[in-house]
A protein has these predicted regions:
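N-terminal intrinsically disordered, low-complexity, charge/repeat-rich segments that act as generic
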Residues: 2-41
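Glycine-rich active-site loops that engage anionic ligands at enzyme catalytic sites
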Residues: 27, 37-169
């Protein structure tokens, strides 16, 4: 058995516990990455995210200009007022301490927002929300490629990158 973060994976015929996952699709470039939920670390926040992904959700990305290899995405706000809360998980992170492949979820004003960390960040501030998932090891290289594509869309093309986030199968 191999342990990676708080998750275990199948090795040489052993069986891993059932792990729910999310898929982040990038239709513009025909790519996607899968991330396993960290339900043991952030059970409440993972459950909120899972519930909000009953239907696939379109989101618009934005990439920081100078602080590192991370991008965030926001869904369209709801048409009607929603009950809002703090939306912070059990664990606190600085941008500099989110693990490679970390997916952060923050519940604010309806669906909230996701961030994907595909490399190091230099911003020494606390993130909003908490890490709820981690990109599977086999998709880390794809995560770096899609991160660069989000950067290119924003910085070079000046066109938004739209993603679709859904429950994994």
């Amino acid at each position: 058995m191999i342990y990676w973060g708080s998750m275990s994976y199948v090795v040489a015929g052993t069986v891993s516990p059932m792990v729910r996952s999310i898929v982040i699709e990038f239709p513009k470039i025909g790519s996607s990455v899968r991330a396993d939920l960290w339900e043991d670390m952030e059970p409440e926040l993972c459950e909120v995210l899972w519930g909000n992904l009953e239907n696939p959700t379109k989101m618009v990305c934005r990439h920081p200009v100078s602080s590192g290899q991370e991008f965030s995405a926001e869904a369209r706000p709801p048409r009607h007022p929603v009950k809002s809360g703090l939306g912070v998980g059990r664990n606190r992170y600085l941008y500099t301490t989110v693990p490679l492949g970390g997916v952060v979820y923050a519940v604010t004003g309806g669906f909230g927002g996701l961030s994907l960390y595909y490399g190091p960040c230099t911003e020494p501030l606390q993130i909003r929300g908490s890490v709820v998932a981690r990109v599977i090891p086999g998709d880390l290289e794809k995560a770096a490629k899609v991160g660069r594509a989000v950067w290119d869309a924003q910085a070079l093309e000046h066109k938004p990158m739209v993603i679709v986030v859904r429950r994994g199968e």
